[in-house]
């Protein structure tokens, strides 16, 4: 946020045309929040087939879903993108249906219940948000449990191999992690067919090496399931059991369920939003910027968190608290979740702790120095995924750059500090010309006239792409801010960085179109990047002997 000090080839093949049926979002100059011109607009943008502003275009027919919510499965994958009371709508939880724990959980407060994977619960109250009051069948104790850690007993959500609402690309990321063998698999909701599922399997062959095959599991009118018409099953469970015993037309027999990663809880605990400063312990300083510091710390003596401390006067506590209420509802697996706040100055912002730090430091000084283009493009695709969600929610980031992306294990990237830049009251920042303002990342219409929209975020994303491929080099090397502003206004754009494919540079240049509404959507950018190395392959494999 603000000024942070930092310790093959597939291209767009058709001429980019703006879509007259898809107007750009209105300016968000004065307000970070829903765009009143877009309220009621369908999230599925429609447009001509060769339009970069729509991912439903024919240009990327094999694109993964931009609506992935949680990459690591479990019941959390049933959550919507904003706060909900019951992730299992229609399930009676008042003692009629029992729930089973999908993961271990260690109580964080005296009101919580500790439990182990496989424990069973009777739900007493599930109407108060993300933490449910429950009674453990195993111990008889009552307390609160995170609702995304449980699923109805004997349901498909309770199966270890079921990963819920997960996109194709995230399934591939998980299955291709080191340690997984050929035949490792998962089942997820189909992105393209309502009521259907997809089976994703890790495979290997001499030509492609390790890869993932996807099979559509179709539903019969009678209620059964099949991949190939000659092998039909009453339940998904029976289908999975069959293919663990025989490949029977698949690329390989199902051998091992894909290991999952325990999801983040939605918030620290029940009613732990505005928290006392004393409940936080600052332990290790991770970084320092113009407006504050970032620490690794512990909440309530139990939970590791990241804590951003803001210098007094950086922003109004009232405005921040109002903004934070919006930010905590923006839930997506590629956004750093906001856990809690200390709302009196000095303001503290409590978020998930990401072990590898900022993307900028990771590229310059960490393991990122050794990454090759496929990994860098995949990280860019993850960031585009998070920004596509912000785009669908009609919000804007305002300060998108590598310093504001955080990295976790297995090259997971999450977007941080979305929306906070609007609240900064520092004169050197608000003037947009001072040393604290990130001119080199900012679209000209935003830097000169304060016209911040999702399309100015697209411009910033193009700059972020240069940071990725150059391993953290400052944009416009050798140029000062004023010079950058003048040159960009005259039409100057950064040349193709060394080692960067021309097709990727072409995407950067699309992001830097002078007219904001000629820049692509994040939905399109995500699709382009996810399929950068695989655009010639079909999304789903046919089973043999269909």
Swiss-Prot record:
- Give residue ranges for domain SH2: 161-258
Enzyme group, top EC level? Answer: transferase
Write out the GO biological process terms. adherens junction maintenance; cell differentiation; cell surface receptor protein tyrosine kinase signaling pathway; convergent extension involved in gastrulation
Q: Compositional bias of type Polar residues: which residue ranges?
A: 48-58
UniProt keyword Metal-binding present: no
Q: Where is the composition biased (Basic and acidic residues)?
A: 1-18
- Lipid-modified residues, N-myristoyl glycine kind: 2
Lipidation sites, kind S-palmitoyl cysteine, are 3
Which parts of the sequence carry Phosphotyrosine? 429, 540
Specify one Pfam family. SH3_1
Q: Any idea which GO molecular function terms this record carries?
A: ATP binding; non-membrane spanning protein tyrosine kinase activity; protein tyrosine kinase activity; signaling receptor binding
Keywords, A to Z, come to: ATP-binding, Cell junction, Cell membrane, Cytoplasm, Cytoskeleton, Developmental protein, Kinase, Lipoprotein, Membrane, Myristate, Nucleotide-binding, Palmitate, Phosphoprotein, SH2 domain, SH3 domain, Transferase, Tyrosine-protein kinase
In this chain the Protein kinase domain maps to 280-533
Binding locations of ATP: 286-294, 308
Give the CC-aspect GO terms.
anchoring junction; centrosome; cytosol; plasma membrane
Q: Where is this region: Disordered?
A: 1-58
Localization per record: Cell membrane; Cytoplasm, Cytoskeleton, Microtubule organizing center, Centrosome; Cytoplasm, Cytosol; Cell junction
- Its main subcellular localisation, reduced to a broad class, is membrane
Q: Which residues form the SH3 domain?
A: 94-155
The UniProt PTM text for this protein says: Autophosphorylation at Tyr-429 maintains enzyme activity. Palmitoylation at Cys-3 promotes membrane localization.
InterPro entries the UniProt entry points to: Kinase-like_dom_sf (IPR011009), Non-receptor_tyrosine_kinases (IPR050198), Prot_kinase_dom (IPR000719), Protein_kinase_ATP_BS (IPR017441), Ser-Thr/Tyr_kinase_cat_dom (IPR001245), SH2 (IPR000980), SH2_dom_sf (IPR036860), SH3-like_dom_sf (IPR036028)
Q: In which tissues is it expressed?
A: Widely expressed.
What is the top-level taxon of the source organism? Eukaryota
What functional role does this protein have?
Answer: Non-receptor protein tyrosine kinase that is involved in the regulation of cell growth and survival, apoptosis, cell-cell adhesion, cytoskeleton remodeling, differentiation, G2/M progression and cytokinesis. Required for convergent extension cell movements during gastrulation, acting with fyna via rhoa. May be required for epiboly to occur, possibly through its effects in calcium signaling. During embryonic development, phosphorylates ptk2.1/fak.
- PANTHER family of this UniProt entry? TYROSINE-PROTEIN KINASE (PTHR24418)
**Protein name per its UniProtKB record:** Tyrosine-protein kinase yes
What is the protein's species of origin?
Danio rerio
The protein's gene is named yes1
């Amino acid at each position: 946020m603000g000024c942070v000090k930092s310790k093959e080839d597939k291209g767009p093949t058709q001429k980019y045309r703006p879509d007259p049926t898809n107007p750009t979002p209105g300016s968000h100059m004065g307000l970070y929040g829903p765009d009143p011109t877009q309220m009621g607009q369908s999230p599925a943008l429609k447009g001509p087939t060769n339009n970069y502003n729509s991912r439903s275009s024919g240009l990327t027919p094999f694109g993964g879903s931009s609506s992935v919510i949680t990459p690591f499965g479990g019941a959390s994958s049933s959550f919507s993108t904003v706060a909900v009371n019951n992730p299992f709508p229609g399930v009676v939880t008042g003692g009629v249906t029992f729930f089973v724990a999908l993961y271990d959980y260690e109580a964080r407060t005296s009101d919580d219940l500790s439990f182990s994977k496989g424990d069973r619960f009777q739900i007493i109250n599930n109407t108060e948000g993300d933490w449910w009051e429950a009674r453990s069948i195993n111990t008889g104790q009552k307390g609160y449990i995170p609702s995304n850690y449980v699923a109805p007993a004997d349901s498909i959500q309770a199966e270890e191999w079921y990963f819920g609402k997960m996109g194709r690309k995230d399934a591939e990321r998980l299955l291709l992690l080191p340690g997984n063998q050929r035949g490792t698999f998962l089942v997820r909701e189909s992105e393209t067919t309502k009521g259907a599922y997809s089976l994703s399997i890790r495979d290997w062959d001499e030509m492609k090496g390790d890869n993932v095959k996807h099979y559509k599991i179709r539903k019969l009118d009678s209620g059964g399931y099949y991949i190939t018409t000659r092998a039909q099953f009453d339940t998904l469970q029976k289908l999975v059991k069959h293919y663990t015993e025989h490949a029977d037309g698949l690329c390989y027999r199902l051998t091992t369920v894909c290991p999952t990663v325990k999801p983040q809880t939605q918030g620290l605990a029940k009613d732990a939003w505005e928290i006392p400063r004393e409940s936080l312990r600052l332990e290790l300083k991770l970084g320092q910027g113009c407006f504050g510091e970032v620490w690794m710390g512990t909440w309530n003596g139990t939970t590791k968190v990241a804590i951003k401390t803001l210098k007094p006067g950086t922003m109004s506590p009232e405005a921040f608290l109002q903004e934070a209420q919006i930010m905590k509802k923006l839930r997506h697996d590629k956004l750093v979740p906001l856990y809690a706040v200390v709302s009196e100055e000095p303001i503290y912002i409590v978020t998930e702790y990401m072990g590898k730090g900022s993307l900028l430091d990771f590229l310059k000084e960490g393991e990122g120095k050794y990454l090759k283009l496929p990994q860098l493009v995949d990280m860019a695709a993850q960031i585009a995924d998070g920004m596509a969600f912000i785009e669908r929610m009609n919000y804007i980031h305002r300060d998108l750059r590598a310093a504001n992306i955080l990295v976790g294990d297995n090259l997971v990237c999450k977007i941080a500090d979305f929306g906070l830049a609007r609240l900064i009251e520092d004169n050197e920042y608000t003037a947009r010309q001072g040393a604290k303002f990130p001119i080199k990342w900012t679209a000209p219409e935003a830097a000169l006239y304060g016209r911040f929209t999702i399309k100015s975020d697209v411009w910033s994303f193009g700059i972020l792409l240069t940071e990725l491929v150059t391993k953290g080099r400052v944009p416009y090397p050798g140029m000062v801010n004023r010079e950058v502003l003048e040159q960009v206004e005259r039409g100057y754009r950064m040349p193709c960085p060394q080692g960067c494919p021309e097709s990727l540079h072409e995407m950067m240049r699309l992001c830097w179109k002078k007219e904001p509404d000629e820049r692509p959507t994040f939905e399109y950018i995500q699709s382009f990047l996810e399929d950068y190395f695989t655009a010639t392959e079909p999304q789903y494999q046919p089973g043999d002997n269909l």
